[in-house]
């Protein structure tokens, strides 16, 4: 309930702000809402109800403004620490750069305004230097985006120390629950050139940029009415050996509902994908009067096993549709120019609450080609699966070490002498991987 309707509040109906068309009254301590249209509610849960929510953020005293974490959700992700230029654009004096932590807003538990942000925090004092709001897309009849946004995933932080770029500070990439990838400028760059898709080169025209600038780089176009492609886990990043492009790799899956209970299974259409950032190592900018790129700008490599459908220079990237309501259950891992995805296949019927099956999908980083057959041969009931079967249950993040891949599994592994650990040989194709730098992960 809203305890004090004299204070600011926001009312949402099915993800749409209806505050201006709703009247709230408080009679004897009981708050009543009067809408301008009828909404459905079934207390038995036998039929679908409309989703009505009220958000009211508590007031902040003047003494606590520098520690304003009111919009922080459940912090599932890990902060990243680096040195940021304290004067922003044009600050070439690295001696007075400041240590900051980049923390995503966390899981908002589907509460509007909570967790859909990124905090830049003074590492020494804990004060909030900047709260960067990330858009929670409004519902429209085309995209049908009805997911309440937040950012449970860890950020991707790229410093010049971990790459061949020429700037101080970092370029930050965050992917949110509704599948947008946002690029944030925390460098000393003063301007950025534009990338020409026709020539594959940067133009001589430059656009001024400032510290804390951001724009949406990509959008997977998530909707519970169409595909149920939630993005809970972080991306991985690296330079493709053949393309020489900077890539971001991700996967979708509703880990809060692994077996898709009370969900139309025909509307569960998860994906694995790789996206190029054409502007790297510069910041780039949003397209004027255009929507962010989506999978329409990418090659569908779902059935490609020989590289014949490799993305061209002007394609944004590649994507693979995952069948049988499978879902990516942890962040992908790059090693040896191959990206590895931990995948879960839910059981159906009488065992719909069971463990499900675990697979590792291996994909060529540059082309999106399915390389899973190189991991081993599936036998018996798994012989027709396109990814490599490794046991029952949910996989952890896959770790590459030497020539091996390691992962924990919640059920039973196919490794006979290691019940809850998966150990298999990796595929070696060579990759420059930025996630292994101590400067980025410290």
PLM region descriptions:
Residues 1-6, 34-442:
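Beta-propeller fold recognition
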Residues 8-9, 14-27:
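Extracellular/luminal ectodomains and secreted, surface-exposed scaffolds of diverse proteins
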Residues 29-33:
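A generic structural motif
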């Amino acid at each position: 309930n809203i305890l004090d309707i004299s204070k600011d509040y926001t009312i949402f109906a099915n993800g749409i702000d209806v505050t201006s068309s709703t009247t709230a009254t408080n009679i004897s301590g009981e708050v009543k809402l009067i809408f301008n249209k009828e909404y459905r509610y079934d207390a038995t849960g036998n039929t679908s109800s409309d989703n009505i929510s009220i958000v009211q953020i508590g007031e902040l005293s003047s003494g606590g403004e520098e520690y304003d974490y009111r919009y922080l959700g459940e912090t599932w992700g890990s902060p990243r620490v680096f040195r940021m230029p304290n004067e922003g654009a044009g600050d070439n004096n690295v001696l007075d750069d400041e240590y900051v932590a980049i923390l995503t807003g966390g899981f908002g538990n589907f509460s509007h305004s909570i967790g859909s942000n990124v905090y830049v925090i003074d590492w020494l004092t804990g004060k909030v230097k900047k709260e960067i709001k990330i858009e929670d897309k409004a519902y429209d009849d085309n995209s049908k985006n009805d997911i309440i946004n937040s950012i449970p995933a860890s950020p991707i932080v790229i410093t010049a120390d971990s790459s061949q770029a020429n700037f101080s500070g970092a370029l930050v990439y965050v992917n949110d629950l509704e599948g947008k990838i946002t690029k944030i400028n925390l460098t000393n760059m003063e301007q950025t050139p534009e990338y020409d898709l026709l020539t594959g080169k940067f133009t001589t025209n430059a656009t001024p940029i400032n510290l804390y600038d951001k724009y949406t780089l990509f959008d997977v176009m998530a909707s519970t009415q169409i595909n149920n492609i939630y993005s809970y886990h972080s991306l991985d990043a690296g330079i493709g050996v053949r393309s020489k492009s900077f890539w971001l790799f991700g996967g979708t899956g509703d880990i809060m509902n692994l077996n898709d209970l009370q969900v139309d299974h025909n509307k569960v259409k998860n994906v694995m994908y790789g996206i190029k950032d054409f502007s790297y190592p510069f910041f780039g900018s949003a397209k004027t009067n255009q929507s962010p790129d989506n999978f329409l700008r990418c090659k569908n490599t779902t059935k490609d096993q020989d590289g014949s459908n490799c993305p061209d220079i002007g394609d944004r990237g590649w994507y693979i549709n995952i069948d049988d309501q499978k879902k990516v259950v942890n962040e992908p891992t790059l090693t040896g120019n191959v990206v590895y995805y931990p995948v879960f296949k839910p059981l159906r019927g009488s065992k719909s609450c069971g463990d499900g099956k675990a697979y590792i999908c291996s994909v060529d980083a540059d082309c999106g080609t399915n390389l899973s057959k190189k991991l081993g041969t599936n036998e018996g009931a798994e012989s027709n699966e396109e990814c490599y079967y490794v046991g029952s249950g949910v996989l952890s993040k896959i770790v590459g070490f030497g020539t091996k891949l390691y992962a924990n599994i919640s059920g039973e592994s196919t490794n006979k002498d290691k019940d809850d650990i998966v150990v298999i040989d990796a595929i070696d194709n060579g990759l420059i991987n930025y996630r292994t730098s101590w400067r980025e992960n410290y």
